[in-house]
Design a protein with these regions (language model features):
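Interfacial loop at the N-terminal end of multi-pass membrane proteins
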Residues: 2-5, 28-51
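Non-cytosolic membrane-interface motifs at loop->transmembrane helix junctions
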Residues: 38-45, 102-114
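Hydrophobic alpha-helical membrane segments
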Residues: 79-95, 114-121
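Membrane-helix boundary connector in multi-pass membrane proteins
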Residues: 91-111, 127-128
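Core segments of alpha-helical transmembrane spans in multipass integral membrane proteins
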Residues: 17-21, 25-26, 45-67, 81-88
């Protein structure tokens, strides 16, 4: 199998697994509070509703990533859609959470690093997919 195709496929799978893991704290506010270092986090129904909607979209994205992994080069557009708006938006939200004082930088930093790595890998994957078409 072509190494570039394998690289792109691995990118999709790794991102899908990380995204799937992110859904768990979305559905458990208590776990979210523990992970994010927010003591006694007990949000209202409005938060729970919004996170339920967000979790539905996240699960849909997981399925989209698994689908794209089946034909990685042909579905390379999913790579760009994952970079912008998904991960760029997540990074901006994390930066906002730190700047507003909701979260500590040390709490958000590992997530930002992971997101930057995924953005770089997906950008490289998109480049590889373009080379495969020629």
């Amino acid at each position: 199998m072509n190494r570039k195709i394998t690289f792109i496929r691995v990118c999709y799978w790794v991102c899908a697994i990380f995204e799937l893991l992110a859904v768990i704290p979305m559905l458990s506010p208590k776990l979210f509070g523990v992970i994010m270092g927010i003591r006694d986090f007990n949000p209202g129904y409005d938060y729970r509703y919004a996170m339920g909607v967000a979790a539905s979209f996240a699960l849909g994205w997981v399925l989209l990533l698994f689908w794209a992994a089946r034909k990685p080069a042909e579905r390379k557009g999913v790579l760009l859609l994952t970079i912008v708006p998904v991960f760029t938006g997540n990074m901006l939200s994390g930066i906002y959470a730190v700047s507003s004082g909701l979260l500590k930088a040390a709490t958000v930093f590992p997530s930002l690093v992971m997101q930057v790595l995924i953005i770089v890998a997906f950008g490289l994957g998109y480049f590889y997919a373009g080379k495969l078409e020629k």
